[in-house]
Amino acid sequence: MKPLPAASFALDAGKHWWERADLGFSNGELCFAGHSVAALASWSDRPVFLYSGERVLANLARLQAALDSAGVSGAVLLAIKANRFPPLLTTLARSGRCGADVCSPNEIKAALSAGFPAEKISFTATSLSDDDIANLARHPRIAVNLDSLSALRRFGERAPGRTIGLRINPEVGVGGSAKLTYSGRKPTKFGIYSEQWPEALAMVRQYGLRVSTLHVHAGCGYLTEQLTSWRAAIDRALSLRPSLPDLTCFNVGGGLGVPHTATWGSLDLRLWAQALHQTFAKTGLSVLVEPGDFIVKDAGLLVLKVNGIEDKGGTRFVSVNGGFNLAPEPVFYDLPCEPVPCRLRVGAERRVTIAGNINEALDLWYEDIMLPPLAEGDSIAFLNAGGYASSMSSNHCLRGDFEEILVPQP
């Protein structure tokens, strides 16, 4: 990870950029969702993920309010690939406030098992196998968005006359990094390209399919400054509407980003809703949005314990009991999980590098960050671990064990 700006953890330093009503220090103790983080994590010697159901529901409510303010009918679908912890999914399903965006047959099972009704599940994926197609054909009440001519042909053969959606590659991309940009100048595997559109329409007619939905997902992690490009991607896809007489819905995908450091901006939901209003208010189309990170990322922490502290070659290394395999985004996508001590010790801050326990040189959580004194056995909470962390984890070096806790209401 790149070095971060120094941040004071002194008790009188005022609020940190990430603090909010349900996350912050109280008398030197980091508290989350009304509980001491150190106390919540103390019952296990393994790495522990903590999730706040209340924060997830609050994020969902904020997004739904923004969607409502846009003056369009629509709904939110949680991208469950971001976090598939069953108690969390069940909480959302029982709330009735959102549906589920899924991208594999096993995610269909997870969504149904959590209690999401089939009518509130939408499937969008790529590189589908014949078995995938057969599975989708067995779920007539689940919405299906197809993203290739091959999938369209095989689905049409298997389920002629079905109502479907088509995922479009708008050739405009947005994202938190180049690796999170799903369309643009460089060809990608996602979506149907403009030069393929005539053939796609021919297949729709051949198999008697009814296209009710257009789908676009241009990338992940976009913030306010990328809204112009995001809207351009939607406009590109919306230009295809005249050739789709049965179109009733537009799925704008997910990708809504959250800040990871003090220097990052946030996504202005007012401007996001304004863009939706300007694009869709007069179209008569309903709008679906499929966020993952925006709903769950800042509702989760990963708590790791300090194994050792040692000076090597002029660098103070703080080793912890979990590595990048538990939360790959900091290494893969340069999306940091900022470390915060769970209890503040008195003393001067030191510049440290936090290292994981995986036998890979890149397994560094943070390099050259100023932190207050730490000791072996202390706990460190890594922020923004609620999305694409446990769900992307691996058992590399056979160190994939962890616990997950849905934090109870205080």
Regions found by a protein language model. Give the residues of each.
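Short, basic, glycine/proline-bearing loop/turn elements
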Residues: 73-74, 118, 137-141, 262, ...
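A charged N-terminal "starter" segment
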Residues: 1-143, 149-162, 198, 204-210, ...
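Charged (often Lys/Glu-rich) extended helix/loop segments that serve as interaction or gating elements
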Residues: 275-277, 282-410
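Short acidic, glycine/serine/threonine-rich loops at helix termini
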Residues: 88-90, 112-114, 133-135, 155-158, ...
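Active-site loop/helix belt of alpha/beta enzymes
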Residues: 2-13, 18, 170-308, 312, ...
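Structural preference for beta-strand elements that scaffold enzyme active sites
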Residues: 75-77, 97-99, 118-122, 141-143, ...
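Electropositive phosphate-/nucleotide-binding environments in soluble metabolic enzymes
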Residues: 34, 50-57, 82, 86, ...
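Active-site beta-loop-alpha junctions enriched in small/polar residues
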Residues: 79-85, 103-106, 126-128, 147-151, ...
